[in-house]
């Protein structure tokens, strides 16, 4: 794997992981459209670790609160904001893990990795995001997250297992429909990404650990660093822009890309 290819994969993953445009969809399309070899699972795990560190750093105050509450949650007590937040995140993560395991066992996860599927999900869920963003009420703050809303957003998140859907895009869609403002919807979506990336990356990491050699580990470290930088930049810019700008620019991008992919897929 060349350094250019490695950096390209890391930057694409970093820039698209938290924007509502689907990082997995872009990474699947990269080898198909460019002719480059697939980056492999070790690099996949590495760039996800990089983006994980980025979101943890950006929302470090909220993460610290949740981590502080984990101990109380384990003891069956949810009498602090941290324990409640940790429980909400746990509940929101269960659906995607269950559905992800089912797709993996049946082989459907690989069957869905096609340009046509990505084109349709880019287009359809982009339009759904626009509809939710324009019509969704603004009646709640992230601090008023409930267990019921965490479960509902978790069900939305499970749809992100279809390539091209976008984990952040679909959870933001769900949050907007539940009444959360743009910044608060994005914040909840980003916090939900932490246990999801931890769980999926941890399982995949165990699978690929035996495959890695020192040269590959060096590439993985480089990929993680570049993914971290790109993700932190994208996350910072998006959260700032959401104070004054809607999700429409991302929707336009999704619709345009989805349309192009469908034309290519069916031509």
Curated annotation (Swiss-Prot):
GO terms for molecular function: undecaprenyl-diphosphatase activity. It is found in: Cell inner membrane. GO terms for biological process: cell wall organization; peptidoglycan biosynthetic process; regulation of cell shape; response to antibiotic. Belongs to the UppP family. It is an enzyme of class 3 (hydrolase). InterPro entries: UppP. It is a multi-pass membrane protein. Bacitracin is thought to be involved in the inhibition of peptidoglycan synthesis by sequestering undecaprenyl diphosphate, thereby reducing the pool of lipid carrier available. The keyword Iron does not apply. This is Undecaprenyl-diphosphatase. It catalyses: di-trans,octa-cis-undecaprenyl diphosphate + H2O = di-trans,octa-cis-undecaprenyl phosphate + phosphate + H(+). It comes from Dinoroseobacter shibae (strain DSM 16493 / NCIMB 14021 / DFL 12).
């Amino acid at each position: 794997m060349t350094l250019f290819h490695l950096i390209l994969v890391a930057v694409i993953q970093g820039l698209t992981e938290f924007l509502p445009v689907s990082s997995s969809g872009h990474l699947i399309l990269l080898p198909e459209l460019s002719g480059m070899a697939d980056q492999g699972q070790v690099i996949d795990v590495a760039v996800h670790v990089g983006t994980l560190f980025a979101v943890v750093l950006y929302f470090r105050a909220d993460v610290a609160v949740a981590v502080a509450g984990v101990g109380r949650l384990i003891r069956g007590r949810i009498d602090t904001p941290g324990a409640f937040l940790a429980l909400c995140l746990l509940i929101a993560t269960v659906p995607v893990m269950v559905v992800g395991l089912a797709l993996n066992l049946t082989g459907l996860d690989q069957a869905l990795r096609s340009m046509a599927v990505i084109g349709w999900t880019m287009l359809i869920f982009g339009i759904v995001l626009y509809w939710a963003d324009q019509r969704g009420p603004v009646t709640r703050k992230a601090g008023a997250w409930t267990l019921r809303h965490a479960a509902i957003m978790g069900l939305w998140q499970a749809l992100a297992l279809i390539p091209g859907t976008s984990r952040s895009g679909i959870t933001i869609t769900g949050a907007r429909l539940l009444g959360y403002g743009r910044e608060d919807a994005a914040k909840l979506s980003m916090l939900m990404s932490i246990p999801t990336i931890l769980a999926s990356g941890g399982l995949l990491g165990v699978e690929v650990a035996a495959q890695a050699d020192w040269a590959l580990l060096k590439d993985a470290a480089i990929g993680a660093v570049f993914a971290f930088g790109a993700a932190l930049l994208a996350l910072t810019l998006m959260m700032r822009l959401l104070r004054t700008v809607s999700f429409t620019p991302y929707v336009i991008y999704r619709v345009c890309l989805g349309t192009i992919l469908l034309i290519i897929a069916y031509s």
